[in-house]
Amino acid sequence: MAKILMTGTSGAFGTLAAQAALKAGHQLAAAMREPDGRNAPAAAALRALGATVVEIDVIDDHSVARGTEAAIAALGGLDVLVNIAGVGTHGLSEGYSSAQLMRVFDLNVVGVHRMMRAVLPTLRAQQTGLVINISSLLGRLSLPFYGPYSATKFALETLSDTYRAEVSQFGVDVVLVEPGGFKTSWIDALVRPEDTERLSGYGQFADVPAQTLTQVEAMLDTRPEQDPAKVAEAVLMLIDTPAGARPQRTVVDFIGMAEPVSMMNDLATQATAGVYQAFGSDELLTLKLR
């Protein structure tokens, strides 16, 4: 059974993925902010299932270092890092202040980088390991009103691909999960643009983002197959798949976006292989197994 450190376990996807991992018999260090404060109920529920709960705020270098060290000590090692912590955005892009945009990037992109830097020395030293980064279909295509969020996921995709090549020869696998839209508490926590004065220049069009989000939520209510538990199942599948056999990207969507994004992924894989071969670096695309 794998020794797993998972971030964002107080949120919807994180809670489901943590529960799935524990029920499958894996050892889990469940990371979250304020496990003795506002997230105490989530922490208690995971402890009851057998998890070790560690406090990690992925936007704080010291918190990441302390929490990761505590997790590895509690687990007696580490096999898998699952990066789930993140935040969504919805609204007109111009209405987001520079500070808002920087905060979203700090959490969704730099936070993943912090976590990977914290665990990679351990994984590289043992010449084996797995990192699963939760991205989004909006990291492969763009839709209006999700600009800052989508930008972070495009960045995460590139960061993950680069890491994947750079650590492949140390036996460390880096893969992505790309969920579509799911109706979870994540929607309630979406970051909205704070510059209302700037948005006033859009007139009635400033109301369109809220209207479209209402339509999306109504649509999701009619699509029970778009179950967030499917994302947790995808994470568990990747953990249980042998090294060298895992897909680089796993799309999780059941409302029509999976096929076109999967086609884009296949084309990107082919193009990337050609570029790496042209530069004589194609061996980096193959995971080195012990």
Where in this protein do the model-derived segments appear?
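Active-site helix of classical SDR
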Residues: M116, T152
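Conserved glycine-rich Rossmann-like NAD(P)H-binding loop of the short-chain dehydrogenase/reductase
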Residues: A24-A40
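Residue(s) in the substrate-gating loop at a strand-loop-helix junction
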Residues: S136
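Rossmann-fold cofactor-recognition segment
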Residues: R47-H62
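SDR active-site lid
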Residues: Q169-R246
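Substrate-binding pocket helix/loop in short-chain dehydrogenase/reductase
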Residues: L92-S93, Q100-M102
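Conserved glycine-rich cofactor-binding loop
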Residues: S10-G11
